[in-house]
């Protein structure tokens, strides 16, 4: 791919942050499947000498199980290079001496080993999938409404995501329901939180203008990165929709067909 004057901003890039679901793979039955060309694209980035990190709002598995699933697909990824909301919220809970009521996926529960959940004084909500029943949502509501100062943590705030059989509602929908019912504003842990992105940047030891984010979610991936001073590329895979390219509130610095094309652009124009 020839150098493109519209991609001049890539010349200063020393590091890349990749979203995972919708960029590397589509989730679904059997663990999902890798998006065409993404395994090789990740390898090319690793071989390029650029700093590489992975940033996900995945909350249906522990990081270890999540990375294991990706390795089965062919990705050579280290757990220490993957940043997800659950470990981050555990640190917050411990620092603030909070005891959560958990409305999360069963497979995420091990992330909270050692966290005191007796007599809850806050609620943590993640992508609970089938556990988002009326009964479970109402139980979380009752905990929140019964607190003098309700505290709600949401592991991301996505509206929907793509699985192999179609789009699925994400945690943000249920977060909004609890916010409305309890007149409380959730503390978002994960993308698009600036603090979450700053944690990744600190680990890379790079400045925001030296890093580009590649994601399929215009608001949480691209917009979140841009709010921290990074550039954002949106791929036309995963939850991408053509209407994203004329969104009035967030505009990606560039749009590319897939991760392979994003890597072509980054390596050619840096």
Swiss-Prot record:
Q: What class of enzyme is it?
A: hydrolase
**One biological-process term from Gene Ontology?**
phosphate-containing compound metabolic process
Q: Out of the domains of life, which is the source?
A: Eukaryota
Q: How is the cofactor bound?
A: Binds 1 Mg(2+) ion per subunit.
Supply the EC number(s).
3.1.3.-, 3.6.1.1
Name the UniProt key words of this record, in alphabetical order.
Answer: Cytoplasm, Hydrolase, Magnesium, Metal-binding, Nucleus
Q: Which family does it belong to?
A: Belongs to the HAD-like hydrolase superfamily.
> Which Pfam families does the UniProt entry name for this protein?
Hydrolase_6, Hydrolase_like
Q: Where does substrate bind?
A: 19-21, 56-57, 191
User: What's its job?
Assistant: Phosphatase that hydrolyzes imidodiphosphate, 3-phosphohistidine and 6-phospholysine. Has broad substrate specificity and can also hydrolyze inorganic diphosphate, but with lower efficiency.
Q: Which cofactor does it need?
A: Mg(2+)
Question: What cellular component GO annotations does this protein have?
Answer: cytoplasm; cytosol; nucleus
| Catalytic reaction equation(s) | diphosphate + H2O = 2 phosphate + H(+)
State the protein's name.
Answer: Phospholysine phosphohistidine inorganic pyrophosphate phosphatase
Which PANTHER family does the record match to this protein?
4-NITROPHENYLPHOSPHATASE-RELATED, PHOSPHOLYSINE PHOSPHOHISTIDINE INORGANIC PYROPHOSPHATE PHOSPHATASE
Organism this protein belongs to = Danio rerio
Localisation: Cytoplasm; Nucleus
GO terms, molecular function: inorganic diphosphate phosphatase activity; metal ion binding; phosphatase activity
| Residues bound to Mg(2+) | 19, 21, 216
Gene of origin? lhpp
Q: Does the keyword Hydrolase apply?
A: yes
Does the keyword section mention Metal-binding? Answer: yes
């Amino acid at each position: 791919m020839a150098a493109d004057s519209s991609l001049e901003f890539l010349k200063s890039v020393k590091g890349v942050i990749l979203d995972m679901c919708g960029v590397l793979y589509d989730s679904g039955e059997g663990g999902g499947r890798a998006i065409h060309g993404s395994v090789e694209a990740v390898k090319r980035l690793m071989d390029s000498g650029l700093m590489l990190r992975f940033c996900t709002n995945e909350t249906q598995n522990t990081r270890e199980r999540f990375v294991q699933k990706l390795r089965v697909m062919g990705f050579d990824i280290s757990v220490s290079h993957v940043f997800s909301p659950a470990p981050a919220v555990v640190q917050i809970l411990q620092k603030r001496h909070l005891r959560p009521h958990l409305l999360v996926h069963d497979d995420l529960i091990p992330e909270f080993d050692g966290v005191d959940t007796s007599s809850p004084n806050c609620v943590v909500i993640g992508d609970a999938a089938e556990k988002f029943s009326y009964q479970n949502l109402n139980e979380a509501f009752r905990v929140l409404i019964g607190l003098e100062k309700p505290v709600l943590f949401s592991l991301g705030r996505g509206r929907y995501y793509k699985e192999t059989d179609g789009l699925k509602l994400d945690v943000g929908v249920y977060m909004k329901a609890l916010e409305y019912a309890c007149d409380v504003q959730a503390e978002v842990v994960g993308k698009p939180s600036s603090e979450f992105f700053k944690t990744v940047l600190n680990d890379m030891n790079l400045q925001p203008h030296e890093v580009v984010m590649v994601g399929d979610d215009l608001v949480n991936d691209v917009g979140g990165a841009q709010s921290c001073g990074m550039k954002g590329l949106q791929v036309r895979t995963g939850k991408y929709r053509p209407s994203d390219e004329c969104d009035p509130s967030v505009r990606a610095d560039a749009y590319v067909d897939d991760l392979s094309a994003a890597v072509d652009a980054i390596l050619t124009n840096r």
